[in-house]
Amino acid sequence: MVSFSEITTLGVGGSIACFIECSPDEFVERAPGLFRPGHHVLVVGGGSNLVASDCPFPGTVVRLKSRDTIVSDDGDYTRFSISAGTSWDDLVSYSLDLGFDQLSPMSGIPGTFGGALAQNISAYGAAVRDVLGSVEVYDACTSEVVTFGLEDMRYGYRTSALKNVRNKVILGGTLLLKPGPTPVLHRQLANALKVDLGTYCSGKQVRDQVLRIRAEKGMLPRYLVPKGFDVCNTSSVGSFFVNPIVSKEHLSRLRRLVPQGALNSSVIQTDEMGGVKVSAAFLLEQSGFEKGFCISGSQAAISTQHSLAIVNRGGATAAEVIELAGLITRTVSRKFDIHLIPEPVFVGLEL
């Protein structure tokens, strides 16, 4: 019997009553019989953004298989048609091999293409929404396959219209890419490459540097970690909390609670809606949660390389992960009156 601990990058979670792997087409054929009253159905990708309860899951978990990516001309763009089960990083690597560099800043992000669309991934100045063509979705309420455009996805920070929605399943989608190099739009990446912002660099240069940055933070899947880098922090869901957005008034109160000058441009950023995005990692550190912190006797800990990652040090349970995450959210809330929102999807759990 398959368990969530076997199919998630965090490596926690109980047994699954029924586990199915199938292609998107096979899923559409079988779906009406799966989505029946009283039966729980969960469709997963790479399990890199999922935390499941230790209790047995009584329903069906479906993992969609990948299929070949189809590349075709579409006017000024080249259209990549991709199945939901395709590894995101494999897609990045494949697009680079074909001379399309736009996805290179998002190298090394674990999980699948379907998860990337639902999660609205972005990294180092690039975002999946900026190149989205369409999303193919199975609607369990109507048993039909429908197409979502960019507006239909209602993208927000690390969220979309399809995140945490169990009756709509992403089957695949299209990205519209242009060949050639892409400008470096993120300060940390520019500094690492030793170039000015806006400089055009080859996708391979960008990819190599992004993978190195992620390895230094312990934010790469184990199979992508370059030789010589630590792999002890790879059992995680990446960043466990999203960076909170606060009002400018709240930011003024926050300044009085932290050391003078601490709220600099490296930890705050103006949001496109007029709020201020604050580094969640900064809030954890200012609340006393240092890298490597753990509750006594627990195998769940904060990564020794990145303050925002909760890692499984070996044999951790979902209960231990939630215990640590709960302690963090309560402490940050008491100290700064800021509620941290978890980034991963919870199954049978809540903070």
Curated annotation (Swiss-Prot):
<dbReference type="InterPro" id="IPR016169">
    <property type="entry name" value="FAD-bd_PCMH_sub2"/>
</dbReference>
<dbReference type="Pfam" id="PF01565">
    <property type="entry name" value="FAD_binding_4"/>
</dbReference>
<dbReference type="GO" id="GO:0008762">
    <property type="term" value="F:UDP-N-acetylmuramate dehydrogenase activity"/>
</dbReference>
<dbReference type="InterPro" id="IPR003170">
    <property type="entry name" value="MurB"/>
</dbReference>
<dbReference type="GO" id="GO:0071949">
    <property type="term" value="F:FAD binding"/>
</dbReference>
<keyword id="KW-0274">FAD</keyword>
<dbReference type="InterPro" id="IPR016167">
    <property type="entry name" value="FAD-bd_PCMH_sub1"/>
</dbReference>
<keyword id="KW-0560">Oxidoreductase</keyword>
<keyword id="KW-0131">Cell cycle</keyword>
<keyword id="KW-0963">Cytoplasm</keyword>
<feature type="active site">
    <location>
        <position position="158"/>
    </location>
</feature>
<dbReference type="Pfam" id="PF02873">
    <property type="entry name" value="MurB_C"/>
</dbReference>
<feature type="active site" description="Proton donor">
    <location>
        <position position="239"/>
    </location>
</feature>
<keyword id="KW-0573">Peptidoglycan synthesis</keyword>
<dbReference type="InterPro" id="IPR016166">
    <property type="entry name" value="FAD-bd_PCMH"/>
</dbReference>
<keyword id="KW-0961">Cell wall biogenesis/degradation</keyword>
<protein>
    <recommendedName>
        <fullName>UDP-N-acetylenolpyruvoylglucosamine reductase</fullName>
        <ecNumber>1.3.1.98</ecNumber>
    </recommendedName>
</protein>
<dbReference type="GO" id="GO:0051301">
    <property type="term" value="P:cell division"/>
</dbReference>
<feature type="active site">
    <location>
        <position position="343"/>
    </location>
</feature>
<feature type="domain" description="FAD-binding PCMH-type">
    <location>
        <begin position="11"/>
        <end position="213"/>
    </location>
</feature>
<dbReference type="InterPro" id="IPR036635">
    <property type="entry name" value="MurB_C_sf"/>
</dbReference>
<dbReference type="InterPro" id="IPR011601">
    <property type="entry name" value="MurB_C"/>
</dbReference>
<dbReference type="GO" id="GO:0009252">
    <property type="term" value="P:peptidoglycan biosynthetic process"/>
</dbReference>
<comment type="similarity">
    <text>Belongs to the MurB family.</text>
</comment>
<dbReference type="GO" id="GO:0071555">
    <property type="term" value="P:cell wall organization"/>
</dbReference>
<dbReference type="GO" id="GO:0005829">
    <property type="term" value="C:cytosol"/>
</dbReference>
<keyword id="KW-0133">Cell shape</keyword>
<dbReference type="GO" id="GO:0008360">
    <property type="term" value="P:regulation of cell shape"/>
</dbReference>
<keyword id="KW-0132">Cell division</keyword>
<dbReference type="InterPro" id="IPR006094">
    <property type="entry name" value="Oxid_FAD_bind_N"/>
</dbReference>
<keyword id="KW-0285">Flavoprotein</keyword>
<dbReference type="InterPro" id="IPR036318">
    <property type="entry name" value="FAD-bd_PCMH-like_sf"/>
</dbReference>
<comment type="pathway">
    <text>Cell wall biogenesis; peptidoglycan biosynthesis.</text>
</comment>
<keyword id="KW-0521">NADP</keyword>
<comment type="function">
    <text>Cell wall formation.</text>
</comment>
